[in-house]
Amino acid sequence: MNKNLHPLMLAGTGSDVGKSIIAAAFCRIFLQDGYHPAPFKAQNMALNSYATPEGLEIGRAQAVQAEAAGVPCHTDMNPLLLKPSSDHTSQVVLNGRPIGNRNAYEYFRREGREELRKEVHAAFDRLAARYNPVVMEGAGSISEINLRDSDLVNLPMAMHAGADVILVADIDRGGVFASVYGSVMLLRPEERKHIKGILINKFRGDIRLFESGVKMLEDLCGVPVVGVVPYYKDIYIEEEDSVMLQTKNIRAGQGKVNVAVVLLRHLSNFTDFNVLERDPRVHLFYTNNTDELMKADIILLPGSKSTLSDLYELRRNGVAQAIVRAHREGATVMGICGGYQLMGREVCDPDHVEGEIERLPGLGLLPVSTRMQGEKVTRQVRFRFLEDSAVCEGYEIHMGTTTPLADVPVSPLNHLADGREDGYFVDRTCMGTYVHGILDNPSVIDYLLEPFADKLKETAFDYKAFKEEQYDKLAAHVRKHVDLPLIYQILTDND
């Protein structure tokens, strides 16, 4: 039987240094080595969220890490989720349920922080009682000293957990010595003793040229460098932050089915399109350029954290009109969640759930109307797509109800296992749904691509098997470049 390991926290010198991916790697490594790991991030800020089996909401990154760990996701893995709804305001989701909107000043004030701290501590304690080890992820930089008193997620959380902290730094962006040394030295002495190792991430070139740098960092900081992990391009793990959209295709291609995702300002759950991005039959691109939209065979309207605001922008910049024109000229248009709402006759928000806009006309492609409501629907679903007999899976996360207009027939896109119906189907070129993850189902993708048979030179692939292969590749990559015996020693040391 394996020993109990201390919790392991992957903290960072800054944002986007690779904490989430390294945490996923260790979740898979511990699983491969016979442990029963689980991920944990006390507070996450992201638009990409996921519905747990209990119908509650967590950050998508922790759902991915749970998948790497081979366990079902749970709200205890991410008890506090912030979903930005504007540049200054976020929806606060506590233990999987929204508790209201807060601006940054209100959220980081000391009043109320201790109640939130108790909640995230309790979530960790429940998780630690069930799993060994807990793989924790910090947020942003560990040395934001102006926010020290209100920090719920970095060193204060590690101290509560009794975690060993590995500091992750991104050498690719430059300044790694200053960022590592500065991060360590800005910590209080009682915090600093929890830093047990440094991991240099995203290294390019010959690692032998950095051997002297490793020694310098160890001498400066007084802790070992537990690994130098090279940059990779051939491992595909779901990404958490929409900043990664900057690396995606932005133009139509040739020789494949051109699928355009409309680039909304408040786009959420862009992971809905991961399968299409890997499908060899498809050229997926993200755009709000009207000329590029006209080249698309299929246009996908994604989810939005602020549907009315995005609808206003689409009408203002001409994208709404371009989508309607493209559909009239033969393009398939499909909306998911907020995108489904956008496709209807109108979107109404009389109770100001989203903001000040009370009503806007939609694109008019679907004979439905949406009314925003304060209660959020969050659940995993099983369903049949149209009349197909295959059982599909997905999840719902939305605020608002969408209903057909009074003078049109009921024409659902999906028949849910609990007897409910979802979405609206006009014909195979025009449809909408509330189900995120609908495009993870092969039968749905095959249906969308079937009219473009002249472009289909490749075959589809098994996405679930593909993801498992990628987790194993990631684990092998990290295992090769870290001192795993040293890390196990750290996690079992009684000092």
From Swiss-Prot:
- Respond yes or no to whether keyword Transferase is given for this record: no
Q: Which UniProt keywords apply?
A: Cobalamin biosynthesis, Glutamine amidotransferase
**Where is the GATase cobBQ-type domain positioned along the sequence?**
256-444
Q: In which pathway does it act?
A: Cofactor biosynthesis; adenosylcobalamin biosynthesis
- Alphabetized Pfam families for the sequence: CbiA, GATase_3
Instruction: Tell me one GO molecular function of this protein.
Output: catalytic activity
Return one Gene Ontology term, BP aspect.
cobalamin biosynthetic process
Q: InterPro entries, from UniProt?
A: Class_I_gatase-like, CobQ/CobB/MinD/ParA_Nub-bd_dom, CobQ_GATase1, CobQ_N, CobQ_synth, GATase_3, P-loop_NTPase
Q: Where is the active site?
A: C337, H436
| Function description | Catalyzes amidations at positions B, D, E, and G on adenosylcobyrinic A,C-diamide. NH(2) groups are provided by glutamine, and one molecule of ATP is hydrogenolyzed for each amidation.
- Give the family this protein belongs to, as stated in its UniProt record: Belongs to the CobB/CobQ family. CobQ subfamily.
Q: What is this protein called?
A: Cobyric acid synthase
- The organism named in the record is Bacteroides fragilis (strain ATCC 25285 / DSM 2151 / CCUG 4856 / JCM 11019 / LMG 10263 / NCTC 9343 / Onslow / VPI 2553 / EN-2)
